[in-house]
């Protein structure tokens, strides 16, 4: 069973939740600090705390319900005000400025992320002013042992309140919850900017999905040991590098990590060429 988690104070998360509640019959329960909505297909949990500070929320919720995976329904904030749908895994490569713990990573859910992205792609024409983009690993919670990812609407109050945008996200989430295909190629991504354009293209057009992704701005904190940890948490078989932003020092770290973890290193250009979706 998959669990959607939203925050009481998150406008976009509430908007997505309200749409999800129209897709099935739910039993409502108040337990501890949570409000639960239980259906035969999936569960929803609402918390009072901000999601980025929700470390160990999987352990807290496991006292009341059985579930295998978390989909965090959330807002995305940025100063540029872009209209975007985003997806990413949480965790910190370095300091913990926005929740979680330093140098700590949540366990990703790459298969569900991929199924969500493909379902979302089919609906983007309903909101042509929006674009989809991956984000790299950032912010809390980092202390999540169940597979999880963030599914976000950005980037201002206007988009968070957009009913149709939330409807598109909720429908894609439901498709991902129902999806049976769980054998996509899984990689950890290294390189690029925060919005990871090459990883985004790979998610949309190839047979690959991602667990953790590390932007160029995190390279000063990236070690082979940390990268091995990310590969294992992601259950990845590959590391994909954005070859235009990875220097020789980082390539050395990547190759060392790949040897220890027993995975293959691929360049993003090769992946886009050789692993296209049919």
From Swiss-Prot:
It holds the Pfam family tRNA_deacylase. It catalyses: a D-aminoacyl-tRNA + H2O = a tRNA + a D-alpha-amino acid + H(+); glycyl-tRNA(Ala) + H2O = tRNA(Ala) + glycine + H(+). Its cofactor is Zn(2+). One of its GO terms (biological process) is D-amino acid catabolic process. InterPro entries: Deacylase_DtdA_archaea (IPR018033), DtdA (IPR007508). It comes from the Archaea. Keywords: Hydrolase, Metal-binding, Zinc. Binds 2 Zn(2+) ions per subunit. GO terms for molecular function: D-aminoacyl-tRNA deacylase activity; zinc ion binding. Its EC number is 3.1.1.96. Monomer. Belongs to the DtdA deacylase family. D-aminoacyl-tRNA deacylase with broad substrate specificity. By recycling D-aminoacyl-tRNA to D-amino acids and free tRNA molecules, this enzyme counteracts the toxicity associated with the formation of D-aminoacyl-tRNA entities in vivo. HAMAP family: Deacylase_DtdA. This is D-aminoacyl-tRNA deacylase. It comes from Archaeoglobus fulgidus (strain ATCC 49558 / DSM 4304 / JCM 9628 / NBRC 100126 / VC-16). The gene is dtdA.
């Amino acid at each position: 069973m998959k669990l959607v988690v939203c925050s009481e104070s998150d406008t976009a998360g509430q908007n997505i939740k309200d749409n999800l509640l129209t897709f099935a019959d739910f039993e409502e329960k108040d337990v501890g600090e949570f409000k639960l909505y239980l259906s035969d297909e999936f569960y929803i949990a609402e918390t009072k705390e901000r999601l980025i500070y929700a470390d160990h929320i999987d352990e807290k919720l496991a006292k009341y319900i059985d579930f295998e995976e978390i989909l965090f329904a959330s807002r995305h904030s940025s100063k540029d005000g872009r209209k975007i749908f985003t997806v990413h895994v949480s965790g910190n490569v370095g300091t913990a400025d926005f929740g979680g713990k330093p140098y700590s990573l949540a366990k990703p859910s790459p298969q569900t992320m991929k199924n969500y992205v493909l379902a979302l792609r089919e609906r983007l024409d309903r909101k042509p002013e929006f674009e989809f983009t991956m984000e790299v690993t950032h912010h809390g919670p980092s202390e999540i042992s169940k597979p999880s990812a963030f599914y976000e609407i950005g980037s201002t109050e206007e988009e968070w309140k957009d009913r149709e945008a939330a409807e598109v996200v909720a429908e894609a989430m439901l498709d991902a919850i129902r999806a049976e295909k769980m054998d996509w190629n899984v990689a950890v991504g290294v390189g690029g900017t925060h919005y990871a354009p090459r990883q985004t293209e790979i998610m949309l057009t190839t047979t690959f999905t991602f667990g953790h992704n590390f932007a160029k701005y995190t390279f000063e904190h990236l070690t082979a040991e940390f990268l091995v940890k990310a590969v294992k948490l992601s259950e990845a078989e590959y590391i994909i590098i954005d070859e235009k932003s990875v220097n020789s020092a980082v390539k050395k770290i990547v190759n060392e990590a790949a040897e220890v973890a027993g995975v293959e290193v691929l360049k993003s250009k090769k992946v886009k060429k050789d692993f296209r979706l049919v």
